[in-house]
Structures are given as C-alpha cells and as structure tokens.
C-alpha cells in the first residue's frame, strides 16, 4: 500500500472534466490499496458536505492511504491495529508522520470539474509516495498493465502514470532524511522487524568504531562522585559510547590491566545513595612524572580510549590538562618505539579531556558550587546541631574546626546555618592586634542577652591579617579567659562521609550527562572544558582559566590582598559574609539607623508548614533589630489576627535559636485576609505597621494579592509588602526555588533510599512512592532524578496506557538484567495529582498484575513526613539571604516616603498624594497607587534574586486553577531522569 508523500504534502488533487476518465482513475487508485473515505455529488449536497469541496467540482472522491501503525495479535490469530496513541514511539497527533514508527497517511482528491481543462503533457503533475513493499507494488502495477518508468533520482525506485497522465513515483524512504525501509513489519510489528545481514555487519563495524571514554575520580573523595560515575556511564552508553572505569585515580591509567575496566549499564545501579567513590581515588606520584604519563598514554591507546572525564579538584584537573597538551608527543613517541601501530596512532592522535569539579571545599572559581560541597555542609550543620544540645545543657562554648585550607566557604556557610557567634575564614582575616578582644566582646554580648551556648567556627586555614595561623587552641584560650567552659571539636573526615545530599546528587548527575555531550562535541581546537553551574545553569568553562583563577585566590591571600581574594570567589560569597555579620556582630548598636527611619515590620506565616519558616523569621528579626527596627509576629496566620488580634513583638532572645527549628514557632494556617479585610486593616493601623513579610506557599502569594487589591479601600495596605516563598511544592509563581523544598528533597531522598533498600532485599519488589506537590511536578521530577526512579509521573506529562506499558516493559527488562543482584531496588515516583485515573494504588496494582509472580509491587506514601524536621543547609543559607533582601526592600521603599520633603505628614502616612486631582503613589510617583511595585514576590531566577510585582504574576504567570506558575522550569530534569533510567531508550527503540 502506498503511504505518505515524501514531498510533505497533506493531500494532492487530480482534476479532469471527463466522467469516464474520472471513474477509471478512481479504479486505478483503489487497486493500489487506497480507500474511499468521502464522496460528493453536486446535485445532492448539504452545507456540511461543502466543507473542503472545490466550488467548480461536479463530483469529488477522497481517497486515503491510512497511517501504518503497530498491530497486536487478538484471539483466533487475528491481527488488530493498536490505537495510534499506544503504538511504539507515538508522540502526539501534531507529530504524526515525524515519529520513526508511524506515518501520517495521505489523501488524494479526485475531482470531476465542470470547467474546460488544458493538460500540459510536457509538464505533468508529479507526486512521490512511500511504500514499505516496493516489490509487491511493482508487481501489482505490472499486473494491471501500468507503465513502469525507471527513475533517475536516488531516493525514487520507479514511476508510473495514472489514467489522467499524472506521474506517480514510489520510494522506500519515508522521508528525505530517513533510512530505507523494505518491510511493513517496521510499522506493524516494530519488535519483529527482520534485520538484514548488511545491518548486522554495520552494527559490528559501529561497535568497533564506538567512542571510548574513561571516567576517573581523583584527589580527595567527595559525596556525589558515585552519582557522576553513574551519569557518565549511562549517558555514554545511551549516546553509543563505551565507558571504562579507571580505578584508583590516575594510578589506574598508569598501571592499566584490570584497573581499566569497561562498565555496563547495570554496573552502576544503586550508586546515587552511596558516598565516596566505588572506583577509588588516590594521589598518584607516578602520573606527575613524564614516564608515568607515557605509560598512561600507552594503556589508553591499547584499550582504544582517547577521552577522559576527570572528577576531582584543581590539582587533578591541572594534571589532566597537562596530559592533553603532552598527548601528541607521547603517542608519537609510542609509535616511534613500535609500541602501537600506525592505525592506532592515526585513530587516537588527539585526547579529549572534560573536567567535573569534585571538592567539598567549593574552592573552584568559575562555578557556583562543586560536587560534594553541600553534602559536607550538611554534615557540619548536623553535627553542630548535636553539639548545640550539649552546649546549651552545660552552658558551654564549642570551637568547631571545619575543613577549608585555602577556602572559607564551608566555614562561612556553616556559620550562617548554625547561628554561630563568630567565624574565622582565610578570605576575611581579623586584625592581628584586636581579634581576641573582638571575639570576647561578641561572645559576652550574646551571653548577656541570655544565650546559654557559644559556637565559634574555625576554618583549618584561618589566619590573621598578617598571615599568622589562628588555631582552635588559641580560640579556646580566648574563650576560657572570659570564663567560658570551652571544648574543641574537630570534625575531620566526617565531613567527607555519608550519602550525598539531594543537591549534590542533582549536580553530579546533570554535570555527568553534559560531560559526555562535551566529549562527543569536542574538537582538537576546543580547549578542555570543565562543567560548571552558574546562575543555576549547567555551563562549560575553559578548564585552564578556571584552575588559574582558583590559584589566584591563594596568591591574593599570600599577598595580603584580601579584597581581591573575596572578589574572586563566587558572586554570593561577599554578600553571604555581610549577611553573617548582620545577624551575629552588628547587634552591638553600631548599625542603628536614625530614629526617624526606624520601622515597625510585621511577619506572618501563611499556608502549610515547612522547615524553613523559623530560620527566615530569625534572620529577618535579628537583621531588623540590629538597625533599631521593631519586629512583630502575627501569630496563627490571618485567622489569629482577625479573631484574636494575635500580635507579639519579637526580641533577640526569642529567635536566636530558631536557625535549626522546623515547623512554625508563631503558627501558620491557610486563612486569608479576605476572611475579614476590615479587621486586618484595623490591626495594621493599630500597630502602625510600616512593612509586611508574608512567608509561605501559594496561600501566602494569594494573601499578598488580596492585600494589594484592597489598597484602594484601605490605605494602610499601601505599605511595602513582600511574599517570601516557602513551600515544599515550589509552586509559587515568580521563583524557581522556595524555602523548604530542599529539606523536603533531602527527606525524600533518605526515605526512597530506605524503600529501595527494602525492595533490593526482597529482590523482586517494586515500590510506587507517592510524593506531594499538588499540581506542580517539581518535587516528583527532582525526586525521580536524585533517587534513580525508573519512572516519574507528573501532572505536566499526562499518563496513558502506553506510558504504563512502556514502564512495565522497562521494569521487566531491568529485573531480567539484574538477576537478583544487590543494589537492585526499584521505585516509581508518582505525584499525588498526576492523574485521577492512574492513581498510586492503580499503578502499583497494574505492576503487580503484570509481574505474574516474577515481581510484585507495594505503595509507599511518606505524606507529611516530607516537610522534614530540621531545615537543610541550603534552606538555612537561602533563608538568610532572602530574608535580609526582604528587609532591605521594605527599608528602601519606606526611605523614599519618609524622607520626601515635598510630602505632608498625612501624605507620608497614606503613602499617596493628589496631583491635580490624580491619586499618585508617594513611592513611584505613578498615577496609580496599585501599580507602585511595593507588593512583590521575592524569588530566585537562576542565581539572581528578583522582586516581581504580585499583580503582574497573578495576571500573567499564574495557573489559578492548578495553583502554580506557568513556567515549568524543571522539565529538563525529566529528560535526564528518563535517559539514565533507561526509559528514554525504551521509547526510542
């Protein structure tokens, strides 16, 4: 049967004014396998029948060659066509004909016209059709006496003429860019397609010509390295490469043999939750010598490897780049010594190097984060939280020493996240002459305010401004001098241990996949790249430049140019240091603003509880108190304000230990101000609020919009108001990150690790894990990526029967390949709102039924456990960053009003004035108070902090029914997850 035109026409018309020729042509095409789907006669018509009919037609017959799609065997040996949506490779109706396993069909319109027609026999009409049975079609044409015209075009087999004289050509190529198809089984039975001997030979040749990549983990180990090994291995296999593990770092390259081993898909299963690196790491002295690199070159060429993905610190990456520079000389030397053949020399004369930065210190320039850094930070805050309990019990001081010989990132971030009193980091060394006195003042002041514990963080590379080391013992002695019972805790290599946190699993995975792409896209002219993350985007930076800039930091410190050293760190480092000072040191009264500029700032929690509400409230309070502002907590949400006027002023001692406290200390619920807007306005006026920070999820976003919309009726709402998104669902428009979502992901990763362990122990059990998120698939997509789920179901990607069938096929295949081995636990991630039909229980039941004893299924619903207990390090650090930004926003907006000499006292209070009868904002000077951009949602877009007017978000970027933003910024996570689980391979094959 002829199939769709490779000329990309949706239909073609053949016209005649001869009734007999019209019938003859109709019979010709029906003999070729076309079917009549519509007929029209002018004398018998209705308005409906005129749709698509030419005005000059007396008769029309529409002939169609139906799309070829998969068939299945039914009872009695009959074959039934599968629904197109369930066929192999189906994408959508819009893409029909572009999928390799479906064709779009074609329509021929035969028209009998009432006009005189002149046929140009020298330039006849011509169209080309695809057929998967070219020989059968040719035989059929000969049988009916049609003319066979040899073709002069490569893609066209032959042509013929229909009774109207139009040239009809036939091809075995579905499109101009596709491969030749000579069997209908390609469409009807995709799994039964018969492979020719030529295709088998081609495959063998392609096996020999596959790119071979080696993955190395070198230098100090870091949590997340195993995730990188898994990602590089599976992405390499997916893209048609062979991937080798180089064991024990560069030692494996030098020694070769069994220390260079090819990795298969199943070799890297279950690695996401394992800390360290299973392929080992070591510092190799031999590789530092030229003879060692020569031997490494020989071992690589002998195995056909000419690409290296190196995961390590700046030393490991420097060695890799040197190896690439020397490679042409090394391989030429091997050829001269007859250790390799001329063919090997020509094939592998260029080496490709791609770097992944694995370092807990986060000391590499050109990237916002390195693999392992946040896991190490997570370990530090977990241990310091434990220390806090005993320190408070005994009213002790603890000096905690953390890693960071040349970089103070761990020291700075752990200081913020643990509520430390003081930190020592190399980029901001204290004065040699007075650091001891300064330390005493800060710690004594905090004690006088009622604090029972003292925490001082010391980076192992801490120095004073004269480059003298500051040791933990020295710090202890200073604290003992002021009468504090002091202990020293050196965390040491505990910081490297344990399972990687959610962010490091994500980072190592997406960077590992991009590393393989970088290898395949590399040319000898492209400098060796290092895969980095900047502004929340995966980018490639020149390896040499990144390493050189990193070494510049150490040089700047040695030259006592500490400002330059600080600038060379990532863009948030200096800001974070200032944030730490604002909540720990600036409470000494040195940063008080004039009384006329002091504000009353209200904070309210709205929506479901998350683990980061308290840390954000703590920072906003401490930062504001340090400047002389008053901070009021609205207790129990808007319901508490409306019913009881529940407002409480917060003091320093009230919030100082909220840095590691989950839930909400001031209470939260889903009530909205619209429940009684007048009462809300009354209490705002009573307490003379100058600004409002609403911390919460979609309800907080809605509350801000309602307050903004009520400004025309209640002038008190003209105060600057800011919504700080805090929800596990991460569904607030205007931001790519919400406080609490990282804690939730860490909780989910631990939960799923435990579930997978149970599944692995049972050998033949699969768990379907239901996660929260509402109609936002962010949580499910992210969790699926970091837990290695076989399949992820989200509201953004509707589930159908074909999807479930593919996933069960993948599950069955995976069980067959695992053969009951360890680390073979399998999970599916299902968003709670992914489908009304394909629920978590139904998916589990379908899996269990499909298993037929080979495997079984269970459901696992973590429920509100996902909210987490203690906030994660990322949530604590970002709570500090965003809360201070909110305070600054409120201060700036008030400054413009309170210091405007042209406004009267009443106009300053109302925050608007009338200009020639037009109501005008005192903040923006615009003619509409509602549009003065002082009701905003703070968000993180990439790495940039943004303030977006709530009205703009509500009207343009919000799905109100689904309670989320329109921007699905996490879609790429699903693609990477499907690639590494094998799901994408099922769909492409």
Swiss-Prot record:
Regulation of its function: Allosterically activated by ADP, AMP, or fructose 2,6-bisphosphate, and allosterically inhibited by ATP or citrate.
Binding site for beta-D-fructose 6-phosphate 1: 359-361, 403-405, 460, 493-496
The protein's name: ATP-dependent 6-phosphofructokinase subunit alpha
NCBIfam families reported for this sequence: 6PF1K_euk
Residues where beta-D-fructose 2,6-bisphosphate 1 binds: 670, 727-731, 772-774, 832, 864-867, 963
GO cellular component: 6-phosphofructokinase complex; mitochondrion
Keyword Cytoplasm: yes
Entry's family note: Belongs to the phosphofructokinase type A (PFKA) family. ATP-dependent PFK group I subfamily. Eukaryotic two domain clade 'E' sub-subfamily.
Pathway: Carbohydrate degradation; glycolysis; D-glyceraldehyde 3-phosphate and glycerone phosphate from D-glucose: step 3/4
Region (N-terminal catalytic PFK domain 1): 1-585
Binding positions (beta-D-fructose 6-phosphate 2): 396, 487
Residues given in the record as ATP binding sites: 220, 283-284, 313-316
Binding of beta-D-fructose 2,6-bisphosphate 2, residues: 765, 858
Function as written in the Swiss-Prot or TrEMBL entry: Catalyzes the phosphorylation of D-fructose 6-phosphate to fructose 1,6-bisphosphate by ATP, the first committing step of glycolysis.
First-tier enzyme category under EC: transferase
């Amino acid at each position: 049967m002829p199939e769709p035109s490779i000329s990309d026409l949706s239909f073609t018309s053949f016209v005649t004014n001869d009734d007999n020729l019209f019938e003859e042509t109709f019979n010709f095409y029906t003999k070729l396998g076309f079917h009549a789907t519509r007929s029209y006669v002018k004398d018998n018509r209705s308005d409906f029948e005129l749709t698509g009919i030419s005005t000059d037609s007396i008769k029309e017959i529409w002939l169609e060659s139906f799309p070829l799609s998969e068939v299945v065997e039914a009872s009695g040996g009959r074959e039934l066509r599968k629904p197109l949506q369930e066929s192999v490779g189906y994408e959508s109706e819009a893409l029909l004909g572009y999928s390799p396993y479906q064709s779009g069909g074609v329509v021929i319109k035969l028209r009998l016209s009432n006009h005189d027609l002149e046929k140009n026999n020298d330039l006849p009409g011509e169209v080309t059709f695809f057929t998967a049975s070219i020989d059968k079609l040719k035989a059929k044409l000969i049988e009916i006496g049609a003319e066979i015209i040899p073709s002069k075009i490569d893609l066209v087999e032959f042509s013929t003429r229909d009774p109207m004289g139009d040239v009809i050509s036939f091809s075995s190529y579905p499109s101009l860019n596709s491969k030749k198809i000579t069997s209908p089984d390609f469409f009807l039975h995709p799994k039964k397609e018969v492979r020719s001997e030529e295709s088998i030979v081609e495959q063998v040749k392609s096996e020999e010509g596959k790119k071979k990549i080696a993955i190395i983990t070198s230098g100090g180990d870091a949590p997340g390295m195993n995730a990188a090994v898994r990602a590089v291995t599976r992405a390499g296999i997916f893209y048609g490469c062979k991937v080798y593990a180089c064991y024990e770092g560069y030692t494996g390259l030098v020694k070769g043999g069994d220390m260079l081993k090819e990795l298969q898909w199943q070799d890297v299963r279950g690695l996401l939750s394992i800390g360290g690196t299973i392929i080992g790491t070591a510092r190799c002295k031999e590789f530092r010598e030229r003879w060692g690199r020569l031997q490494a070159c020989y071992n690589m060429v002998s195995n056909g490897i000419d690409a290296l993905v190196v995961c390590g610190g700046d030393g490991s990456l420097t060695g890799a780049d040197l190896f690439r520079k020397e490679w042409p000389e090394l391989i030429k030397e091997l050829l001269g010594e007859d250790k390799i053949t001329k063919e090997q020399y020509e094939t592998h004369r260029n080496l490709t190097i791609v770097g992944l930065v694995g370092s807990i210190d986060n000391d590499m320039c050109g990237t916002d984060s390195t693999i392992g850094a946040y896991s190490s930070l997570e370990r530090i805050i977990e241990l310091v939280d434990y220390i806090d309990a005993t320190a408070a019990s005994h009213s002790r001081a603890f000096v905690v020493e953390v890693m960071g010989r040349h970089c103070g990132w761990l020291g700075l971030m752990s200081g913020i996240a643990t509520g430390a009193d003081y930190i020592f980091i190399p980029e901001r060394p204290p004065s040699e002459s007075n650091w001891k006195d300064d330390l005493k003042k800060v710690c004594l002041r905090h004690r006088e305010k009622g604090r029972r514990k003292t925490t001082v963080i010391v980076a192992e590379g801490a120095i004073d401004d004269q480059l003298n080391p500051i040791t933990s013992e020295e710090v202890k002695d200073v604290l003992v001098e002021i009468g504090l019972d002091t202990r020293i805790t050196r965390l040491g290599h505990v910081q490297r241990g344990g399972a990687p946190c959610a962010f490091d699993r994500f980072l190592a995975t997406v960077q590992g996949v991009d590393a393989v792409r970088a290898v395949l896209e590399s040319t000898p002219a492209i400098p060796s790249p290092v895969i980095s993350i900047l502004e929340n985007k995966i980018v490639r930076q020149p390896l040499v430049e990144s390493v050189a800039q990193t070494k510049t930091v150490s040089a700047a410190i040695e030259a006592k140019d500490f400002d330059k050293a600080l600038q060379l760190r990532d863009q948030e480092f200096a800001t974070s240091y200032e944030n730490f000072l604002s909540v720990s040191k600036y409470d000494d009264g040195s940063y008080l603003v004039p009384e006329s500029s002091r504000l009353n700032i209200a904070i309210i929690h709205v929506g479901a509880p998350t683990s980061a509400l308290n840390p954000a409230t703590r920072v906003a309070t401490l930062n504001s108190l340090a400047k002389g502002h008053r901070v009021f907590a609205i207790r129990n949400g808007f319901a508490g304000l409306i019913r009881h006027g529940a407002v409480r002023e917060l003091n320093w001692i009230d919030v100082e230990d909220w840095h590691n406290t989950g839930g909400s200390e001031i209470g939260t619920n889903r009530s909205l101000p619209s429940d009684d807007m007048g009462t809300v306005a009354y209490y705002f006026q009573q307490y003379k609020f100058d600004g409002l920070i609403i911390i919460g999820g979609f309800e907080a976003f809605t509350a801000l919009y309602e307050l903004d919309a009520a400004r025309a009726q209640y002038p008190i709402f003209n105060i600057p108001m800011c919504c700080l998104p805090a929800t596990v669902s991460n569904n607030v428009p205007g931001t790519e990150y919400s406080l609490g979502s990282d804690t939730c992901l860490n909780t989910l990763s631990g939960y799923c690790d435990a579930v997978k362990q149970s599944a692995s122990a049972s050998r033949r059990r699969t768990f379907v894990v239901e996660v929260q998120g509402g109609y936002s698939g962010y949580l499910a997509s992210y969790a699926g990526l970091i837990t290695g789920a076989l399949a992820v179901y989200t509201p953004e990607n509707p589930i159908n029967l074909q999807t479930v069938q593919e996933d069960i096929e993948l599950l069955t295949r995976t069980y067959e390949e695992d053969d009951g081995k360890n680390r073979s636990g399998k999970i599916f991630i299902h968003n709670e709102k992914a489908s009304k039909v394909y629920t978590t229980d139904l998916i589990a039941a379908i899996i269990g039924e499909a298993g037929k004893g080979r495997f079984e299924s269970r459901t696992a619903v973590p429920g509100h456990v996902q909210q987490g207990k203690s906030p994660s390090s990322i949530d604590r650090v970002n709570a500090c960053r965003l809360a201070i930004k909110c305070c600054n926003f409120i201060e700036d907006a008030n400054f413009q009003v309170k210091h405007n000499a042209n406004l009267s006292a009443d106009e300053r209070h109302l925050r608007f004035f009338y200009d020639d009868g037009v109501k005008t904002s005192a903040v923006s000077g615009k003619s509409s108070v509602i549009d003065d951009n002082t009701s905003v949602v703070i968000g993180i877009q990439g790495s940039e902090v943004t303030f977006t007017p709530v009205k703009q978000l509500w009207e343009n970027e919000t799905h109100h029914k689904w309670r989320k933003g329109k921007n699905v910024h996490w879609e790429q996570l699903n693609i990477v997850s499907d690639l590494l689980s094998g799901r994408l391979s099922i769909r492409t094959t």
